[in-house]
């Protein structure tokens, strides 16, 4: 299983990389724009925040296949082993095929259906990113889409992985993992929710209180 953070917040990545067994960091144009740092600045900073390890993902902005390929080359000039995110449009599928031929790893993004995701994998995408919560918001089932896509990739494109994205709750993320999803990327608020349990804090406080009462200290 691979766990990613979906953010461009360098400080948060550095802090959470101490805690989480991170495989890397994913970004998209909206995330980069919110951070107000250009790619050539923030991508190296994110790489350094992870101790020079882990995979980074960044997305193309062009809408034609040729433009997407040029964007991918620019991204690879910033971070040599970056995974290039390509929206799974008709032009995006063509770009994924072209990038596969160049040996540039890709992630098919903006996936709203299992068939769409399968096509990106067959075109050569190493990862496929279904938008779980956004599918739910449109009246579909994000978890069912992940389940179907996982089965399709297992049967027809076994070298590709589902990297589920767009979560609002830890439950959605866990349900994806239970469905067999190999990778997930979490926004910071959902990542924090996964390790924030008030009952745990209360239990630890009670342990300390009892130990202090018996031995006059809180150390062993």
Swiss-Prot record:
GO terms for cellular component: cytoplasm. Its main location: cytoplasm. InterPro entries: Aldolase_TIM, F6P_aldolase, TAL/FSA, Transaldolase_3B/F6P_aldolase, Transaldolase_AS, TSA/FSA_arc/bac. The gene is fsaA. It is found in: Cytoplasm. Catalyzes the reversible formation of fructose 6-phosphate from dihydroxyacetone and D-glyceraldehyde 3-phosphate via an aldolization reaction. It catalyses: beta-D-fructose 6-phosphate = dihydroxyacetone + D-glyceraldehyde 3-phosphate. GO terms for biological process: fructose metabolic process. Homodecamer. This is Fructose-6-phosphate aldolase 1. GO terms for molecular function: fructose 6-phosphate aldolase activity. HAMAP family: F6P_aldolase. Keywords: Carbohydrate metabolism, Cytoplasm, Lyase, Schiff base. Its EC number is 4.1.2.-. The active site is at residue 85. Transmembrane segments: none annotated. It comes from the Bacteria. Belongs to the transaldolase family. Type 3A subfamily. CDD domains: Transaldolase_FSA. It is an enzyme of class 4 (lyase). It holds the Pfam family TAL_FSA.
């Amino acid at each position: 299983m691979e766990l990613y953070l979906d953010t461009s917040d360098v400080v948060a990545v550095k802090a959470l990389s101490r805690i989480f067994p991170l495989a890397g960091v994913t970004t998209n144009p909206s995330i980069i724009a919110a951070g107000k740092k250009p790619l050539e600045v923030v991508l190296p900073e994110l790489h350094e925040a992870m101790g020079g390890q882990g995979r980074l993902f960044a997305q193309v902005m062009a809408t034609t296949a040729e433009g997407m390929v040029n964007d991918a080359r620019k991204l690879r000039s910033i971070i040599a082993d970056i995974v290039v995110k390509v929206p799974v449009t008709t032009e995006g599928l063509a770009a994924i095929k072209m990038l596969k031929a160049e040996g540039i790893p890709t992630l098919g993004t903006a996936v709203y259906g299992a068939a769409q995701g399968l096509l990106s994998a067959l075109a050569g995408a190493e990862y496929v990113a279904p938008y779980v919560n956004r599918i739910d918001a449109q009246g579909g089932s994000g978890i069912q889409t992940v389940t179907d896509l996982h089965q399709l990739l297992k049967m027809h494109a076994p070298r590709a992985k589902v990297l589920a994205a767009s979560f609002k709750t830890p439950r959605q993320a866990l349900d994806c993992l239970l469905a067999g999803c190999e990778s997930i990327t979490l926004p910071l608020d959902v990542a924090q929710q996964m390790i924030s349990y008030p009952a745990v804090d209360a239990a630890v406080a009670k342990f300390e209180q009892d130990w202090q009462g018996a031995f006059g200290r809180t150390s062993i």
